[in-house]
Amino acid sequence: MKIKQLGIVSAGVALATLGTSAAQAALVVVPTGLNPGDQYRLVFVTSGTRNATSSNINDYNTFVTNQVTGSALATQLTTAGFNLGTITWKAIGSTSATSAKVNTGTDGSQPDVPIYLIDGNKVANNNADLWDGSIQTFINRTQIDTSGTDSVWTGTNVGGSAQSPLGNSGFPPMVTIGSPVQTDASWINMIGLSSSNSYTLYGMSSVLTVPTPAVSVPEPSSLLGFITLGGLMLGGAVRKARK
């Protein structure tokens, strides 16, 4: 009887472990189709919020970086073989002194690479595609693996330059917001709202290189199969215990 009970416990533990892995694998930091040595960027929307009263772009970069620190995104990057100390995070936002294109290095000053949401979906083929007035998918996944729907501070127009920028000193102090659930121009430039409000920010990584060898993180669909197998194991153990 003890052996049967052990079988049930073991199967249950296996099932629970697989279930946990499935939940963690929802974030994809090495998109499908990329090979070791390939370069790309990742983007996300923060789960946390802040005001837009500062005219110092570094305040927003620090906020975005702090959102990643210790998050599910950071864990997934480490699991995939990245050195977190070599990755920088910048806000996709503009102040009067620094445009979003310059701040993120998508102005041609850095390698021109594809840009992906942290769920594996492509946002833009390259820098020009990012700033052509539309993107390919919502930027609505947060660093803690939740869906973001709140408005996003950008201070930016569709071309990546400042428009009603972060820290706007005009009266009233209006700052441009975008929507994480839009792919047209509204993703970055929707309306202007008071800078004293609290909204989220978009974050973009520095240029990443797929590690060699790349660490493969199972897709959620594959993990579903493992979970099903775990369920069958558990069911079999229970049936045997009843005999």
What are these regions (language model features)?
Residues 22, 61, 200, 222, ...:
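Hydrophobic alpha-helical segments
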Residues 13-16, 150, 217, 224:
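Compositionally biased, low-complexity segments enriched in small residues
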Residues 1-26, 243:
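Sec-dependent, cleavable N-terminal signal peptides
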Residues 20, 235-240:
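Juxtamembrane cytosolic interface motif at the C-terminal end of transmembrane helices
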Residues 12, 23, 207-208, 223-224:
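Serine/proline-rich low-complexity intrinsically disordered segments, especially terminal tails, linkers
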Residues 26-216:
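Secreted/extracellular ectodomain signature
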Residues 218-237:
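A short, hydrophobic C-terminal helix/tail in secreted or cell-surface proteins
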Residues 8, 19, 214, 219-220:
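Intrinsically disordered, low-complexity segments
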